From Swiss-Prot:
Family: Belongs to the THF1 family.
GO cellular component, one term: chloroplast outer membrane
Organism: Oryza sativa subsp. japonica (Rice)
Main location, first listed in the record: plastid
Coiled-coil region: 237-267
A single GO BP: protein import into chloroplast stroma
Residue span of region Disordered: 256-287
Record topology, Cytoplasmic segments: 214-287
Chloroplast intermembrane-facing ranges: 1-190
Domain of life: Eukaryota
Name of the protein described by the UniProt record: Protein THYLAKOID FORMATION1, chloroplastic
Membrane topology, from the record: Single-pass membrane protein
Location of this chain's protein in the cell: Plastid, Chloroplast outer membrane; Plastid, Chloroplast stroma
Length: 287
């Protein structure tokens, strides 16, 4: 289980001294206001944004974590709680950078990471509630994240490697989102690259079944994204998935061992009771 807490996110290592105790992590968290703005783009289209303006005073990491702990009050299994708290710190640092601007690829990346992390969590209802508490603690809209991730996934499933990178020559809602990202990444607006964005790109390629290695190069070029950064962060992501699998296997083994111990303990009193009754029967026969 220790493997999961050593995820190689640089931001997580910097924030290690802010990690809450297990008791605190088992509490839950509070809601913040969603900061949304809408900018018309190309006629009637609108692009929804979650963005911190220059005049905003960002909350501290401690305040964001406290919001989460207030909003979700049920205990979270420690193997999940540790990583969630570390991811929350990392995402807080991204969220309140002056260049941060929400986009659907980022949302897809985070949703992908979250769903991979929480796969196998005992309760689907709790898993959804934790997601809502997490995103709300960052003053963003959890429903927007899910809706945008779903739209991106549906679009990617209808694409192939070539059509994926030719978005700039096409019209459509998702194409408009990708064009906007490309323009901002080129310096025509606010854009802050992140590992979640890299995972979002990876997910698009995966769903489009774009296995040709050069497709990622072309997509990064079309989006004006540094391919070397994407490669590096996808290696980190794959490493995380590997650690998650190992940690969950350890958790499964631990749960099975504890279950077996409980069953053995429950059987022992019954055996003692049977022996006592047998001895009592022998005594009554002697008399």
């Amino acid at each position: 289980m220790a493997a999961i807490s050593s995820l190689p996110f640089a931001a997580l290592r910097r924030a290690a001294d802010c990690r809450p105790s297990t008791a605190a992590a088992a509490a839950g968290a509070g809601a913040g206001a969603v900061v949304l703005s809408v900018r018309p783009r190309r006629g009637s289209r609108s692009v929804v944004r979650c963005v911190a303006t220059a005049g905003d005073v960002p909350p501290t990491v401690a305040e964001t974590k406290m919001n989460f702990l207030k909003s979700y009050k049920r205990p979270i299994l420690s193997i999940y709680s540790t990583v969630l708290q570390e991811l929350l710190v990392q995402q807080h640092l991204m969220r309140y950078k002056t260049t941060y601007q929400y986009d659907a690829v980022f949302a897809l990346g985070f949703v992908t990471v979250y769903d991979q992390l929480m796969e196998g969590y005992p309760s689907n209802e709790d898993r959804d509630a934790i997601f809502k508490a997490y995103i709300t603690a960052l003053n963003e809209d959890p429903e927007q994240y899910r809706a945008d991730a779903q739209k991106m996934e549906e679009w990617a499933r209808s694409q192939n490697g070539n059509s994926l990178v030719e978005f700039s020559s096409k019209d459509g809602e998702i194409e408009a989102i990708l064009k906007d990202i490309s323009e901002r990444a080129q310096g025509k607006g606010s854009f802050s690259y992140s590992r979640f964005f890299a995972v979002g790109l990876f997910r698009l390629l995966e769903l489009a079944n774009a296995t040709e290695p050069t497709i990622l190069d072309k997509l990064c070029a079309a989006l004006n994204i540094n391919k070397r950064s994407v490669d590096r962060d996808l290696d980190v992501y794959r490493n995380i998935l590997s650690k998650l699998v190992q940690a969950k296997e350890l958790l499964k083994e631990y749960v099975e061992r504890e279950k077996k111990k409980r069953e053995e303990r429950s059987e022992t009193p019954k055996s003692n009771e049977a022996v006592t009754k047998f001895d009592g029967s022998l005594n009554s026969m002697r008399h």
